[in-house]
Amino acid sequence: MNQNKNYRVLFSNLYKDTQIQENAKMSEHINFRVGGPVDILLTPNTKEQIVETIKICKENKIPFYVLGNGSNVLVKDSGIRGVVIKLSEFDNIVRTGNTIKAESGALLKDVSAEALKASLTGFEFACGIPGSVGGAVFMNAGAYDGEISFVIKEAEVMSEDGKIITLSKDQLELGYRTSAIMKKNYIVITATFCFESGEKDKIEGRVSELTNKREEKQPLEFPSAGSTFKRPEGHFAGKLIQDAGLKDFTLGGAAVSGKHCGFIINKSNATAKDILDLIEYVQKEVKKQFGVDLYPEVRIIGED
């Protein structure tokens, strides 16, 4: 019996057959559209399934990776050994008054739409971020002068020892693209956001404005993971990359976007290696020309 069959046996009592995929192509599950296969991909739709899955993985020493919408991830060409737990089906959103509680697989744009429907303001910035709630809380995602830390009330997380705990906003220790969840290797289960009442017309106007701005300034027509690099203190990554003469620079099928140099795109059937080589080249050039270190915002996982 091969390893994948062993995995299927371990999880067969917990999942329907349709929730278990063997040798799933990760290129079909991440926005970059690259990456080799994972041994087993599971799509839980309940908290109990998530908790039990992680428990089984730990008890059997199976490596696992929790994936939201795959919007800020780069999977290497040889794929992932072990289990990927994809939370796209764990996506309920419930509004109570001025608060919205969302499961970690819920898309940010859907939470933003729910807020708009109830004339709640504060989440407009997230209307076009392609990520999920779990990933956004994990890295304190943000855009256009807004970020998760401005609106989150608390998050329900799973700690390394398998306990479900609730962390307040302060306990989440949200900073620029970082959090206590990231530092402690916790897993987001749900997040609760708190908003202010606003005027629906103004909220709609802001959402429309930001949507147009994204379409105008970001290379949405190509697969990417959004902003490739974190913002270096005192600088903008895109400006440094452009000033380094790297606009439209291509390596293999990967390219620095001519529309926004902060984005590395899959321009023409790129491999993960193409993208990683380009990331490294950009880092070296910016360091050489300006003495500034660029650090990837995208999470890189898998085997070479």
Swiss-Prot record:
MF term (GO), any: FAD binding
InterPro entries with a match to the protein in the record: FAD-bd_PCMH, FAD-bd_PCMH-like_sf, FAD-bd_PCMH_sub1, FAD-bd_PCMH_sub2, MurB, MurB_C, MurB_C_sf, Oxid_FAD_bind_N
Domain FAD-binding PCMH-type: 33-198
Pathway(s) per entry: Cell wall biogenesis; peptidoglycan biosynthesis
UniProt-listed Enzyme Commission number(s): 1.3.1.98
Needed co-factor(s): FAD
UniProt KW Cell cycle keyword: yes
Chief place where the protein resides: cytoplasm
Protein keywords: Cell cycle, Cell division, Cell shape, Cell wall biogenesis/degradation, Cytoplasm, FAD, Flavoprotein, NADP, Oxidoreductase, Peptidoglycan synthesis
Cell compartments where the protein resides: Cytoplasm
Catalytic activity: UDP-N-acetyl-alpha-D-muramate + NADP(+) = UDP-N-acetyl-3-O-(1-carboxyvinyl)-alpha-D-glucosamine + NADPH + H(+)
Pfam family, one: FAD_binding_4
Active-site residue list: R177, S227 (proton donor), E297
Coiled coil spans: none
Top-level division of the source organism's lineage: Bacteria
A GO term from the CC aspect: cytosol
GO biological process: cell division; cell wall organization; peptidoglycan biosynthetic process; regulation of cell shape
Family listed: Belongs to the MurB family.
Described function: Cell wall formation.
Name recorded for this polypeptide: UDP-N-acetylenolpyruvoylglucosamine reductase
Species of provenance: Clostridium botulinum (strain Alaska E43 / Type E3)
Lineage, top ranks: Bacteria, Bacillati, Bacillota, Clostridia, Eubacteriales
Gene (name only): murB
